Amino acid sequence: MVNSVVFFEITRDGKPLGRISIKLFADKIPKTAENFRALSTGEKGFRYKGSCFHRIIPGFMCQGGDFTRPNGTGDKSIYGEKFDDENLIRKHTGSGILSMANAGPNTNGSQFFICAAKTEWLDGKHVAFGKVKERVNIVEAMEHFGYRNSKTSKKITIADCGQF
């Protein structure tokens, strides 16, 4: 299986912040990677485009992927509302690791987070399935608009997204 690369055009209050590209580990975590890829392209009729990063904690992570409700309470995968943890072999080794947000075991949907640091306490609990390939500095810039309480000072949006 080919490891796809997707992109996010990120804006801050409607102003361009930059484009990040993300390599998906489809060779090891195909179901999770396919969910994220399809939500990036919109080929199933729903997508990440226009959704925001609703939770940003500096030094920890930037969380987004709720395209059904903009507040972090919505979740929808290409397989239905939720799908099982595929495997937990990849580790949260540092900044740029892409992982599924969840509410416990086997509750993956559309929400994801990008690590801003090594977060080993998430190993075995969240499916890490990709890594920011280019422009991790955009993720670092996004951190400046978050607070320790996870609120954001600016609206950080996925203005466009797709697959290379």
From Swiss-Prot:
One of its GO terms (molecular function) is peptidyl-prolyl cis-trans isomerase activity. Pfam families: Pro_isomerase (PF00160). Keywords: Cytoplasm, Isomerase, Rotamase. It comes from the Eukaryota. It catalyses: [protein]-peptidylproline (omega=180) = [protein]-peptidylproline (omega=0). GO terms for cellular component: cytoplasm. Residues 7-163 form the PPIase cyclophilin-type domain. Its EC number is 5.2.1.8. SUPFAM superfamilies: Cyclophilin-like (SSF50891). It is found in: Cytoplasm. One of its GO terms (biological process) is protein folding. Transmembrane segments: none annotated. It is one of six related genes or pseudogenes found in a cluster, thought to result from gene duplication, on chromosome 1. Belongs to the cyclophilin-type PPIase family. PPIase A subfamily. PPIases accelerate the folding of proteins. It catalyzes the cis-trans isomerization of proline imidic peptide bonds in oligopeptides. PANTHER family: PEPTIDYL-PROLYL CIS-TRANS ISOMERASE (PTHR11071), PEPTIDYL-PROLYL CIS-TRANS ISOMERASE A-LIKE 4C-RELATED (PTHR11071:SF466). This is Peptidyl-prolyl cis-trans isomerase A-like 4E. It comes from Homo sapiens. The lineage of its organism: Eukaryota, Metazoa, Chordata, Craniata, Vertebrata.
